[in-house]
Design a protein with these regions (language model features):
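Structural boundary micro-motifs
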Residues: 1-121
Length: 121
């Protein structure tokens, strides 16, 4: 897996980060803490740890990492077509390009942080 500075990555836990530096001793440094679940105690890791980290996708284009069910700018993604992502959360269709993306909440993060209220029927 060839990840370059400026590439975005997505882990199997749903974390998204951008590679900001590859140090002289071949440590990969990201702008977000994506290693916590893998037991790596710092923000940098060697390329041989990529599988342990659980990186499942990488791309220079952030839109390539977004999946149906994720939330972009607070709206649930219903479809992805080429460079467009489609939502329909406010009774009208909305399409986003990569340049319009401000925030991403992956479906994995949503599920991990969601509290379900159980009701007795």
């Amino acid at each position: 897996m060839e990840i370059e500075v400026g590439d975005f990555v997505r882990t199997k836990q749903g974390k998204i980060a951008k590679l900001i530096e590859v140090s002289k001793n071949n440590y990969y440094w990201f702008d977000n803490w994506i290693y916590k679940e893998s037991g790596i105690p710092h923000q940098g890791f060697r390329i041989e740890d990529t599988e342990r980290i659980g990186i499942v996708k990488h791309s220079k284009n952030i839109i390539d990492l977004i999946e149906v069910g994720d939330y972009v700018n607070g709206e649930r993604i219903l479809d992805i077509t080429g460079d467009y992502i489609h939502t329909n959360e406010t009774d009208h269709n909305r399409f986003y390009l990569a340049k319009h993306i401000k925030t991403i909440l992956t479906k994995e993060q949503y599920k991990a942080n969601c509290y379900t209220v159980e009701r007795k029927e």
